[in-house]
Amino acid sequence: MKIFINGFGRIGRCVLRAILERNDTNPQLEVIGINDPANWEILAYLLEHDSTHGLLNKEVRYSNGKLIIGSLEIPVFNSIKDLKGVGVIIECSGKFLEPKTLENYLLLGAKKVLLSAPFMGEYDEKQYPTLVYGVNHFLYQNQAIVSNASCTTNAIAPICAILDKAFSIKEGMLTTIHSYTSDQKLIDLAHPLDKRRSRAAASNIIPTTTKAALALHKVLPNLKNKMHGHSVRVPSLDVSMIDLSLFLEKKALKDPINDLLITASKGTLKGVLEIDLKERVSSDFISNPNSVIIAPDLTFTLENMVKIMGWYDNEWGYSNRLVDMAQFMYHY
């Protein structure tokens, strides 16, 4: 399976690391090119030395247009001119979010495109589906361009799918307690859209927006107009937490809800949803490959209300779902 990565920032590098990790035991994925406008000597350094996920287990260097990782050589570029032979291009730059702009990759020769973000703009949702692996990926019908939704949507969708089926969700509110990202500022500096995100990321708790709850209906259509939410950015480098409050049509108790989640973690959602019984904290989940990790002691119920809290590595978990989805699309 031949993969091309466009954009070699946090997600692009995590995607490559995830592929390298999988290929150590089951070599099926071949990255045949990476594109990013940045200096490739610096990008090679950043791939090997990661402040969050640690040192790569192979030496990395750049030479003569190639990223050399141990004995592996990957052609790298500062612009894309040809994608012939590419099975799936994973778009990680954050710059091309409208489906029509992603069609350019098909014109250059790629067979399929996977976007590492929600789609923007007006588009046909059947032609350009939003899929969350483990929740609705089985609805894929060989479309050429797919959105992998957001890291937060990947975290809440498995929970909502389970609870809506069992209890019927009437409405819900989401708070994502989210580690800061490159969209914020290291020191106080003007943000183009958001006053609060203009403030120093590592020194403040910063309320801002998220479209994860509003966009959930693109994955679970039954929840359209039933969900809303916001984000609170916190001074941590990685790992986030969902605080999901739901009103259910049926009365629910803590133990039956947790039992449903635990059963799913061992069956249909194994590798996507995990259960934490050790009362761990955020740093314990760095480099956890699951989409969400539920702490059963942080499930609370009151009549028809339920609050569920879950951890997710917003970089590594999401990047692993991108690889899962790319493989699924390719082998469809």
Swiss-Prot record:
Listed pathway(s): Carbohydrate degradation; glycolysis; pyruvate from D-glyceraldehyde 3-phosphate: step 1/5
Site residues, Activates thiol group during catalysis: H178
Binding positions (D-glyceraldehyde 3-phosphate): S150, C151, T152, T181, R197, T210, K211, R233
EC annotation from Swiss-Prot or TrEMBL: 1.2.1.12
One GO location term (cellular component): cytoplasm
Catalysis performed (reactions): D-glyceraldehyde 3-phosphate + phosphate + NAD(+) = (2R)-3-phospho-glyceroyl phosphate + NADH + H(+)
InterPro entries the UniProt entry points to: GlycerAld/Erythrose_P_DH (IPR020831), GlycerAld_3-P_DH_AS (IPR020830), GlycerAld_3-P_DH_cat (IPR020829), GlycerAld_3-P_DH_NAD(P)-bd (IPR020828), Glyceraldehyde-3-P_DH_1 (IPR006424), NAD(P)-bd_dom_sf (IPR036291)
Claim: Transferase is one of the keywords in the record: no
Main location: cytoplasm
Binding site for NAD(+): R10, I11, D36, K81, S116, N314
Domain of life of the native organism: Bacteria
Family: Belongs to the glyceraldehyde-3-phosphate dehydrogenase family.
Protein name: Glyceraldehyde-3-phosphate dehydrogenase
Organism: Helicobacter pylori (strain J99 / ATCC 700824) (Campylobacter pylori J99)
Gene: gapA
